[in-house]
């Protein structure tokens, strides 16, 4: 059974950003509502209200809806028109396929001066003699009745015959009320009998008395395994009983009354509960997914079963996940570790062991707006950023250099008596080489006497000719 709650109204007010007090249109159809309540307090600005296909038995708590223009109460359990005088702007009222037998109750709609359309087809009163004439004469403001227009000549004839039609309508109402009283009594009896039958079925095999037999105790204990039926057999018998009851209920003829509608709803609820119990039994608790073993080893897991591609470059590792295109990004959680990457997609883990160690703090995750794919870029360890470009260089520490030096020395076999020139240690005496000092002044040119002139005398005071 359904009730009108604040949460129900908010869920049906998405077109108004889930704001209740300013609602102008509200649809609460097929909610199994039994009673009208709270709407006149929470939604006073309503203009259109849909309540068709529910279990409402009485029109109530709508008198404060002064702006209401259209009220749809089709396919309910209403037996009388009442409590609509306060709906001053009501222009259209739909009461199709209800159980209205008191046709004289439409007189309460005289105060609704803006009422133009009224639907009463499918009600017991619609089968009364002179039903249309009575309604047309009683409500002069009506323009349409059951989807058919009212002409002025039809209204004049109805007003002329109103004094004759009214007592006939009263008699038909009395007959209908007597029939309804009998049907209610029969429905109560059937309901009590069904309750008794259910109690008997639940206590089957027990007549209210306890028996003790000392001689039978040993034999009963010995044959205990044979007497206990397995769970599967009990489940099958219960299933057969439920199917038989279901067939019996749906094949049983019944009248179309408010009680029969309630009975069918209760039966459907019972079936629903039984199915939920069966589904809960069938559900097996799945063991938790192991992502990391006891020894700390990460495993490859693809529980969401999505496609992916892994690219291993010199500088970084790129993981491309084919995430669903229209899935919200808030449902994705990425966790990058040095040796593996884990992505939670709607609570399902995707884990992949990486071929090389990466930097989690330098990693990035981006999602495509066109395809929805998730691309995770994870730079490898040892990456150095220089001049706006990335270069992959191996960084050597002092410990690595010392190891290399030791390895080179170990390759050459050393003996006690070796040639000093081939010694691996450097010669300290030849570290600094002596420098030769050269004169800064130019050397004086030598004067060679000419062989041609024997009388030539060289004067040292005379500068040489250039």
Curated annotation (Swiss-Prot):
Residues 185-206, 269-288, 418-466 are annotated as: Disordered. This is Protein tilB homolog. Pfam families: CS_DNAAF11_C, LRR_9. Residues 123-161 form the LRRCT domain. LRR repeats lie at residues 22-43, 45-66, 67-88, 89-110. Residues 178-204 form a coiled coil. It is found in: Cytoplasm; Cell projection, Cilium. Interacts (via CS domain) with ZMYND10 (via C-terminus). May play a role in dynein arm assembly, hence essential for proper axoneme building for cilia motility. Gene3D superfamilies: Ribonuclease Inhibitor. Belongs to the tilB family.
């Amino acid at each position: 059974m359904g009730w009108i709650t604040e949460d129900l109204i908010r869920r049906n007010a998405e077109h108004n950003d889930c704001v209740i007090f300013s609602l102008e249109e509200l649809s609460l159809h097929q909610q199994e509502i039994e009673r009208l309540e709270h709407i006149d307090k929470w939604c006073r600005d309503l203009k259109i209200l849909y309540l068709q296909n529910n279990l409402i038995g009485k029109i109530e708590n709508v008198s404060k809806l002064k702006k209401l223009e259209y009220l749809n109460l089709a396919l309910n359990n209403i037996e009388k028109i009442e409590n609509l005088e306060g709906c001053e702007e009501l222009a259209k009222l739909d009461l199709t396929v209800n159980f209205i037998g008191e046709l004289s109750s439409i007189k309460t709609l005289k105060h609704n001066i803006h009422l133009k359309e009224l639907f009463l087809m499918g009600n017991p009163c619609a089968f009364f003699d002179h039903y249309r004439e009575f309604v047309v004469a009683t409500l002069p403001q009506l323009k349409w009745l059951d989807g058919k227009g009212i002409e002025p000549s039809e209204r004049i004839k109805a007003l002329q015959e109103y004094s004759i039609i009214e007592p006939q309508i009263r008699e038909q109402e009395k007959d209908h009320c007597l029939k309804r009283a009998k049907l209610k009594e029969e429905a109560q009896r059937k309901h009590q009998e069904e309750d008794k039958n259910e109690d008997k079925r639940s206590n089957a095999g027990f007549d209210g008395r306890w028996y003790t037999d000392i001689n039978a105790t040993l034999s009963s204990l010995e044959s205990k395994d044979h007497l206990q039926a397995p769970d599967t057999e009990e489940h099958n018998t219960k299933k057969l009983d439920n199917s038989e009851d279901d067939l019996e209920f749906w094949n049983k003829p019944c009248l179309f009354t408010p009680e029969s509608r309630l009975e069918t709803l209760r039966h459907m609820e019972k079936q629903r509960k039984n199915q939920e119990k069966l589904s809960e039994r069938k559900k097996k608790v799945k063991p938790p997914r192991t992502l990391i073993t006891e020894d700390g080893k990460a495993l490859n897991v693809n529980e969401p079963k999505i496609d992916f591609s892994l690219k291993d470059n010199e500088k970084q590792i790129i993981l491309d996940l084919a995430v669903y295109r229209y899935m919200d990004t808030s449902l994705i959680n990425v966790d990058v570790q040095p040796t593996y990457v884990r992505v939670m997609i709607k609570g399902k883990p995707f884990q992949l062991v990486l071929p090389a160690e990466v930097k989690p703090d330098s990693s990035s995750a981006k999602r495509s707006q066109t395809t929805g794919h998730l691309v995770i870029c994870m730079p490898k360890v040892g990456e150095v950023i220089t001049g706006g470009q990335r270069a992959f260089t191996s960084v050597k520490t002092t410990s690595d250099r010392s190891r290399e030096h030791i390895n080179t020395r170990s390759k050459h076999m050393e003996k006690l008596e070796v040639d000093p020139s081939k010694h691996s240690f450097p010669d300290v005496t030849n570290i600094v080489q002596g420098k030769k000092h050269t004169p800064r002044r130019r050397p004086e040119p030598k004067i060679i006497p000419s062989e041609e002139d024997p009388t030539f005398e060289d004067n040292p005071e005379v500068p040489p000719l250039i």
